[in-house]
Amino acid sequence: MDLTDALTLFKRLGVNVPSLSAKEFSLAYYRLAKRYHPDHGNNAGHNLMANINAARATILKAFRRRN
């Protein structure tokens, strides 16, 4: 997943990543994980959580390069 796709996914889920610090982004990710994780009875299931995790990894790499 490239950075543009990752940012688009998080924006669709209501998180405006460019305006967040790394810590704020982590908190936003954990809120999404609680909401969309398939073990919590979410019907969106495994694929959405896998995409969220891939997007998170891509965005965290960008945060690390930036700092």
Summary of predicted features, one role per range:
Residues 46:
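Short, well-ordered alpha-helical segments
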